[in-house]
Amino acid sequence: MPNVVVVGAQWGDEGKGRVVDWLAAQADLVARYNGGHNAGHTLVVGGKTYKLALLPSGVVRGKRGVIGNGVALDPEALLAEIGRMAELGLSVTPDNLSIAENATLVLPIHRAIDQAQERLRREPIGTTLRGIGPAYEDKVGRRGLRVGDLAEPGRLAAKLDVLVDHHNAWFRGLGLDEYSRDAMLATLVDLAPRILPFVRPVWADLNDATDRGERILFEGSQAVMLDIDWGTYPFVTSSGTVASAAAAGTGLGASKLGHVLGVTKAYATRVGGGPFLTELSDATGETLRARGQEFGVNTGRPRRCGWLDAAQLRQAVRISGIDSLALTKLDVLDGFESIELCVGYEFDGARVDHLPASLDAQSRAKPVYERFDGWRGTVKGVRERAALPRAAQDFIARVEAVAGAPVSMITTGAERDDTIVLRNPFDAAAGA
């Protein structure tokens, strides 16, 4: 199938937006399948800066966008984002955006719960406090509201009763103010006429598009190591972030997903708490942060920085079925005298090639590094792998060998054209 799934292969912020933007020009549809407005990215197109959190990146390139059922949708946040796009001259309408009728709604009460839970934790997870986790909790608890419920005010009110009663018992137990069901219902009834025109049976649309041979680009949020099952639990997000989540989160069968492209920086970053074995809390880490401008798009939070963990990358490749890698921000490594690459771990006196599952075990694991010579000058503007400095080529080759996947794309600068394409993922998906 000529489709491509883009997943983050680390802890997020790998540059997926940049890669998706490049691929979107070749796609017919771009579909979001997980997460919510807790992760964002910035695109610069035609001299205009677009900051996206819920909208699929393809709408900026004039492509049809899809928000799948796996997304936790805050209707107020979506409408605000559509409004910001309008101010930039980009019209988002039901003609170029569809929303799955069974996508979960994020409500004001979820944000309040998120904030209260984070305050109460002995060790904060580092959530963005936007209500995504509590919304997914309600989804799994079978009391969540879905986008399609907006079309049935009577049913909406009854479901909201169940949800609010459940959470108000928790608020009362903590001595916190209870939430008004009537106020939330009034807000949702007011929002419904602006959301419902976008609602479609997305699963059917995507299957029909695939049958017609159209190219679908699946745009993942967060990353493999933040997956609710496979990430560094409990310091994870609340949804599936591996490639198989694209099937569950849109309704297109797994056999139709096509090529899986994992995106990784040439170094590593992480936001919030949780294990990060190659983290650098020294001048080198500060240099990576400054050169890479490692601050959150939505939150402005500084990201933790460290050397690339190719052993972790191998784990992501195997768990998510990654066919090839996009290696981003290679230029950030310009000028380092030497570069280190984690190729495994030492754990209780033994060498292991994967990250243990438990937090206690992870705290005892130590990275095993290989050192590479750095390179002088810059890789910016280089358009072919063979034209990269020999030291950079050696580093990339070792990343491929340890991770167990070929590098198909390399970004060497901030401009869209600063991209080396070794094999187009859409061509790979089509078997070309």
Curated annotation (Swiss-Prot):
Subcellular location, record wording: Cytoplasm
Binding locations of Mg(2+): 13, 40
Broad enzyme group: ligase
Active site: 13 (proton acceptor), 41 (proton donor)
Pathway terms, separated by semicolons: Purine metabolism; AMP biosynthesis via de novo pathway; AMP from IMP: step 1/2
Keyword Glycoprotein: no
Cofactor note: Binds 1 Mg(2+) ion per subunit.
Reactions catalysed according to its record: IMP + L-aspartate + GTP = N(6)-(1,2-dicarboxyethyl)-AMP + GDP + phosphate + 2 H(+)
Top-level taxon of the source organism: Bacteria
Listed InterPro entries: Adenylosuccin_syn_GTP-bd, Adenylosuccin_syn_Lys_AS, Adenylosuccinate_synth_dom1, Adenylosuccinate_synth_dom2, Adenylosuccinate_synth_dom3, Adenylosuccinate_synthetase, P-loop_NTPase
EC code(s) of this entry: 6.3.4.4
Leader peptide range in chain numbering: none
UniProt GO MF annotations: adenylosuccinate synthase activity; GTP binding; magnesium ion binding
Alphabetical list of Pfam families matching this protein: Adenylsucc_synt (PF00709)
Residues binding substrate, per UniProt: 297-303
Binding site for GTP: 12-18, 40-42, 303, 329-331, 411-413
UniProt keyword list: Cytoplasm, GTP-binding, Ligase, Magnesium, Metal-binding, Nucleotide-binding, Purine biosynthesis
Gene3D superfamilies: Adenylosuccinate Synthetase, subunit A, domain 1 (3.40.440.10), Adenylosuccinate Synthetase, subunit A, domain 2 (1.10.300.10), Adenylosuccinate Synthetase, subunit A, domain 3 (3.90.170.10)
GO CC annotations, alphabetized: cytoplasm
NCBIfam families linked: PRK01117.1 (NF002223), purA (TIGR00184)
Functional description taken from the UniProt entry: Plays an important role in the de novo pathway of purine nucleotide biosynthesis. Catalyzes the first committed step in the biosynthesis of AMP from IMP.
Quaternary data: Homodimer.
Family from the record: Belongs to the adenylosuccinate synthetase family.
Protein name as catalogued: Adenylosuccinate synthetase 2
Gene name per UniProt: purA2
